[in-house]
């Protein structure tokens, strides 16, 4: 018997004499399946310790329907069991479980269903007066009862998603070197992240400080054993959208992303590790905060930073070879180059660059089908060319090369990219960030274009001169896609494609209702934040597609095929967020089978994946029976 580093639950060798034959079969068939696909750390052995055969589809139907009925074995009893969030059911413990685990006197008499508990918890959350208070409530709920937390979130996804994913809101003045908008109010973003050290109650996730870099492997083992991990979400907290460098508080953005993997993809939350690489902070508010919990020093950069990240990635590659490494909210100076360095040698993914790009590309594929045109014939303006903007452009360029057969130079010429210096051209080579040089226009092309008093070519001038068919916003500059810009674009394009992607809502470049009015209902839109439906010229309300990397595991084509607009041009470019688990299954099947086709799978199989098979591996927030280990 030992205590699991992953969850604190007690595990023990299961007493075979106490297991009925059907239960043994369930454990064994489940172990076979999990051992093959590396989705669980259970030892796939028989009673004699002999490894079980890796039969791929054996008992698949049983697993798909009975996975939530298999018992969990534990030696915890009484308050120790109630204090274990991965096992606690609160009022959901059955009478038999209360008797077995010594809980009868520790709980009120009535046994409540998970549905009843969700309704009560949602009512309690709604009574909280502010987004921060709601976030604190949900965080506390997760610390008490993991199943109830995720069940609540799935049932009320639209209500809680913005709270748990961009946790949560606070007044912030946007500082961006484009024309000021004094008429706009301060925006709200990331209050829980900014107040992390103030509201902190108990540790969650892994904190790797550069001050202890010689103990990285030891510290990682303190969190979870290598075989207990499928996914590692890591951030250095420098580039958190809208609020920038947040030091150790970036742990919350990593945890928020981990929550989305569970809610959207069905990944077992106990098999996800959220990590913050604490290399200091350049945020003066944090450095001067006496309660700040992170490393109190200026952010480490250069060679020392690279060596620290390399040591971490080496440990992940060597000790966690089956785990995917997810880079989250790294700064613009590091995101692209770190991905380029580690992508060829280990399974890694930059959400801000690749995830966002994949969803945008899926929406664009849907949009150009509505316009009855080809992606290669578009003229694309990207407004805001940081990590996300660059990732989107790079993703589209790659698609143009692979699918349309364009050369790299031909694909580059469809873009006009705007950042702090205005339109990026060959005259800006000294001030470009890594990767931006791949998308600059030749300065001679724009010699006659109008410039502002600082010599920059702005958005409106680019729209007038380039006549874009697609306008993508990643600037976090609220209101940048104003009436003049949208009407100018609509002069030259019958169905302008306009994606104000900055989030949260108050940072979006435009309100879809305004864009709809300014383009006479002809714009095809998708946003990075939720907005109310808009009314088309025929008077019909239709939902605006919300582009969110929380929907994507991979598979642009699979996602695009689900677009409602393919049946009705006035409908959304992407399916609703409430369908995210269903969508994730379809996308995962497409990606898994593509990996088989390209010889990239390490599973040694040739038979195709099915939706039922993928669905059987999704973790569901349900109460499984508990069995006591003597």
Predicted regions and their residues:
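N-terminal chloroplast transit peptides
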Residues: 1-37
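Metallocofactor- and cofactor-centric catalytic cores in central/energy metabolism, strongly enriched
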Residues: 36-376, 391, 395-396, 403-404, ...
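Glycine-rich Rossmann-fold phosphate-binding loop(s) that bind the pyrophosphate
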Residues: 236, 384-386
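Beta1/beta-strand and adjacent pyrophosphate-binding region of the FAD-binding site
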Residues: 381
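Acidic/histidine-rich catalytic neighborhood
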Residues: 387, 422-423, 428-430, 435
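Conserved alpha-helical scaffold flanking the Walker A/P-loop in AAA+ ATPase domains
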Residues: 455-464
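Cysteine protease catalytic core and zymogen-processing segment of caspase-like enzymes
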Residues: 513-515
């Amino acid at each position: 018997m030992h205590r699991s580093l992953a969850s604190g639950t007690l595990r023990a060798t299961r007493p075979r004499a106490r297991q009925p034959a059907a239960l043994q079969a369930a454990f064994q068939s489940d172990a076979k399946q999990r051992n093959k696909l590396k989705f669980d750390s259970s030892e796939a052995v028989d009673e004699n310790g002999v490894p079980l055969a890796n039969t791929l589809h054996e008992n698949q139907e049983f697993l798909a329907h009975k996975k939530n009925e298999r018992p969990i074995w534990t030696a915890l009893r009484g308050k120790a069991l109630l204090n274990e969030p991965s096992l606690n059911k609160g009022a959901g413990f059955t009478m038999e479980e209360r008797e077995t685990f010594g809980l009868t006197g520790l709980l009120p008499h009535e046994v409540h269903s998970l549905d009843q508990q969700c309704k009560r918890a949602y009512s309690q959350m709604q009574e909280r007066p502010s987004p921060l208070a709601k976030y604190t409530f949900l965080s506390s709920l997760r610390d008490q009862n993991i199943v109830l937390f995720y069940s609540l979130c799935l049932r009320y996804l639209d209500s809680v998603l913005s709270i748990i994913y961009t946790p949560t809101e606070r007044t912030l003045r946007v500082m961006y070197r484009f024309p000021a908008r004094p008429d706009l109010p301060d925006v709200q973003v990331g209050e829980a992240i900014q107040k992390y050290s103030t509201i902190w109650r108990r540790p969650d996730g892994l904190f790797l400080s550069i001050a202890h870099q010689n103990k990285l492997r030891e510290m990682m083992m303190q969190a979870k054993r290598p075989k207990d991990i499928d996914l590692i979400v890591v951030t250095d907290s420098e580039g958190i959208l809208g609020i920038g460098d947040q030091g150790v508080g970036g742990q919350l953005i990593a945890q928020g992303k981990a929550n989305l993997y569970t809610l959207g993809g069905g990944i077992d939350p106990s098999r996800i590790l959220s990590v913050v690489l604490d290399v200091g902070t350049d945020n003066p508010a944090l450095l001067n905060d006496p309660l700040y919990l992170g490393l109190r020093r200026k952010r480490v950069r250069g060679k020392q930073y690279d060596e620290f990240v390399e040591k971490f990635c080496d440990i992940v590659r060597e000790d966690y070879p089956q785990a995917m490494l997810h880079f989250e909210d790294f700064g613009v100076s590091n995101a692209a180059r770190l991905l380029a360095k580690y992508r060829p040698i280990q399974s890694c993914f930059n959400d801000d660059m690749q995830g966002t790009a994949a969803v945008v590309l899926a929406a664009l594929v849907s949009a150009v089908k509505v316009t009855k045109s080809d992606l290669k014939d578009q003229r694309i303006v990207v407004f805001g060319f940081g990590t996300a903007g660059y990732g989107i452009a790079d993703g589209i360029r790659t698609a143009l090369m692979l699918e349309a057969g364009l050369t790299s130079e031909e694909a580059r010429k469809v873009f006009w990219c705007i950042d702090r210096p205005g339109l990026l051209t060959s005259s800006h080579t000294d001030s470009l960030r890594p990767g931006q040089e791949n998308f600059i226009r030749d300065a001679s092309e724009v010699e006659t274009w109008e410039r502002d008093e600082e010599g920059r070519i702005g958005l409106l001038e680019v729209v007038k001169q380039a006549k874009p068919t697609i306008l993508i916003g990643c600037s976090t500059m609220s209101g940048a896609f104003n009436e003049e810009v949208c009407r100018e674009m609509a002069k030259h394009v019958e169905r302008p494609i306009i994606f104000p992607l900055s989030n949260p809502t108050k940072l979006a470049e435009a309100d879809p209702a305004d864009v709809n009015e300014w383009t006479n209902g002809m714009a095809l839109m998708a946003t990075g934040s939720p907005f109310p439906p808009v009314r088309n010229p025929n008077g019909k309300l239709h939902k605006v597609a919300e582009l969110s990397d929380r929907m994507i595991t991979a598979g642009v084509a699979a996602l695009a095929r689900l677009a409602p607009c393919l049946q009705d041009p006035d409908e959304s470019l992407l399916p609703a967020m409430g369908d995210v688990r269903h969508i994730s299954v379809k996308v995962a099947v497409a990606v898994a089978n593509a990996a088989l086709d390209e010889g990239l799978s390490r599973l040694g199989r040739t038979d195709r994946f099915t939706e039922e098979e993928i669905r059987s591996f999704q973790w569901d927030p349900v109460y499984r029976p508990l069995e006591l280990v003597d």
